[in-house]
């Protein structure tokens, strides 16, 4: 074998071994975190086993297991707008939950799509330049995902069964999502659960410049969006925080003021997880 080929072969072997080791470490992290959550919760025993074991090493809520799962005392709500209705939930996810969602999603990321108003199907578009994936129905039954979904249901007051599958997204530098509404303009998507009423957007990283969630019709001041000064309100990505906002007004009609976008990422990576909630059960 020629010396040049030996060098190339050696580099390929090194990279392959590194990828295998990385995957094994990632799998070990997922397994450890899953073990720490046990197999069920008091209100969800019909979905999993009968025995219940919760997060270890949480002494503050040693006598209140539901409070552990809901992170009562940790989550700090902040109302940033009443019209449209926007609430930032600080420390909504634990650091471990953020890493868990990223670990599940990373191997399955694909180019993100948007809903075609004519067909109701996902299509690629320059409106949205990220990569993402949806959790499966099987993954939805995992204890950690159950805990997150139960927390979303409690803080949003929308039943868990009305929620779509969680979507995990990654935005790299120069990627963005142009302003849009989460509610549907087509009739195809309304057949499964009706209209979208609310969104829970959860941030999984914060080592990013730019990438704010921008509401151009909220508030009457200025904000920062991808390094630019804009009219409206923006929320900076902070690991563990979540933004809860409603696409439907108190009158039961879709709220055009809920238009929002993902500002351009200037540096770093922005990871997020989104849960859309409907008027009725989605399955």
Curated annotation (Swiss-Prot):
Binding-site residues, Fe cation: 180, 182, 260
UniProt-listed Pfam families: 2OG-FeII_Oxy_3
GO cellular component: endoplasmic reticulum membrane; Golgi apparatus; Golgi cis cisterna
The EC number(s) this enzyme carries: 1.14.11.2
Cofactor comment text: Binds 1 Fe(2+) ion per subunit.
Fe2OG dioxygenase domain segment(s): 162-279
Residue intervals annotated with topology Cytoplasmic: 1-6
GO molecular function (one): iron ion binding
GO BP annotation list: peptidyl-proline hydroxylation to 4-hydroxy-L-proline
Residues given in the record as 2-oxoglutarate binding sites: 270
General remark: Plants over-expressing P4H1 show absence of trichome on leaf and petal surfaces, increased root hair and reduction in seed size.
The protein, known as: Prolyl 4-hydroxylase 1
């Amino acid at each position: 074998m020629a010396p040049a080929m030996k060098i190339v072969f050696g580099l390929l072997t090194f990279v392959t071994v590194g990828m295998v080791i990385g995957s094994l470490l990632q799998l070990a992290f997922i397994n450890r975190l899953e073990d720490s959550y046990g197999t069920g919760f008091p209100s969800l025993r019909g979905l999993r086993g009968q025995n219940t074991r919760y997060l270890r090493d949480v002494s503050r809520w040693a006598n209140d297991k539901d409070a552990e799962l809901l992170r009562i005392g940790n989550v700090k709500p902040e109302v940033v707008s009443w019209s449209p209705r926007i609430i930032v939930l600080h420390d909504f996810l634990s650091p471990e939950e953020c890493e868990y969602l990223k670990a599940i999603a990373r191997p399955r990321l694909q180019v993100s799509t948007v809903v075609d108003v004519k067909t109701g199907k996902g299509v690629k578009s320059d409106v949205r330049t990220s990569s993402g994936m949806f959790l499966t129905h099987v993954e939805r039954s995992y204890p950690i995902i159950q805990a997150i979904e139960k927390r979303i249901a409690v803080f949003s007051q929308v039943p868990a069964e009305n929620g779509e599958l969680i979507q995990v997204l990654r935005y790299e530098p120069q990627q963005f999502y142009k302003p849009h509404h989460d509610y549907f303009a087509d009739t195809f998507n309304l057949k499964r659960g009706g209209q979208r009423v609310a969104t829970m957007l959860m941030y999984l990283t914060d080592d990013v410049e730019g990438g704010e969630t921008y509401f151009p019709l909220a508030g009457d001041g200025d904000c920062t969006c991808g390094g630019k000064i804009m009219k409206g309100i923006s929320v900076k990505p902070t690991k563990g925080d979540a933004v809860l906002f409603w696409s439907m007004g108190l009158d039961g009609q879709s709220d055009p003021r809920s238009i929002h976008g993902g500002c351009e990422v200037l540096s770093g990576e922005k990871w997020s997880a989104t849960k859309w909630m409907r008027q009725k059960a989605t399955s």
